[in-house]
A protein has these predicted regions:
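Short, small-residue-enriched loops and turns at beta-alpha junctions
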Residues: 10-11, 39-42, 99, 122-125, ...
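N-terminal "arm"/small-domain region of PLP-dependent enzymes with the aminotransferase-like
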Residues: 1-33
Length: 181
């Protein structure tokens, strides 16, 4: 069989499976517990957090793990709206986002936020110009996926980030469980 749906689910590499098997077999304690299994799990979790932080050039206390992409998207979007809601109530996203982004946007609309949904161009991309035109003084968040999980269209996130920096909008959310690294 030729499997072509890696944007939905990708088989993990053998090294990942080996480490996960080891952790699930030998290090299954609750990392918040004070017994031996919990302490071991806490140590491994701290190591993982430090490795990810180092790879990102971030501080370990700024790295958070979630159960998956949907939880991460929800957390990021709702947190941004809560934190920045006093500054404005406008959010820009795309009409072709994953439901993990679209559903939180709909919930925020029900709470009084205004969401602009950008349509992709003929190639399936969101242009920087279209995004710039959608910005307003009360825009608090831009949420754009890097790679569309259904079409494979790749947005130029670096160009989007540069434009947002020039426009002095400091918060961008990128839903990115699809792109291979």
């Amino acid at each position: 069989m030729i499997y072509l749906d890696n944007s939905a689910t990708t088989q993990p590499c053998e090294a990942c499976v080996r480490v996960m098997t080891e952790l699930l077999t030998d290090c299954w304690g609750n990392p918040s517990s004070v017994h031996a299994h919990g302490i071991a799990a806490h140590h491994r979790l701290r190591q993982a957090r430090e490795q990810v932080a180092s790879a990102l050039g971030a501080e370990p206390d700024r790295v958070f793990f979630t159960s998956g992409g949907t939880e991460a998207d929800n957390w990021a979007i709702f947190s941004a709206a809560e934190r920045l809601g006093k500054r404005g109530h406008h959010i820009v996203t795309t009409a072709v986002e994953h439901h993990a982004v679209l559903h939180p946007m709909q919930k925020l609309e029900a709470k009084g936020f205004e969401v602009t949904y950008l349509q992709p161009d003929r190639e399936g991309n969101i242009t920087v110009d279209a995004l710039k035109k959608a910005l307003r003084p009360d825009t608090i968040l831009v949420s754009v996926m890097m790679v569309n999980n259904e079409t494979g269209a790749v947005n130029d996130i670096a160009a989007v980030a540069r434009m947002l920096k020039v426009e002095n909008l400091s918060l961008i959310h990128i839903s990115e469980p699809t792109r291979p690294y």
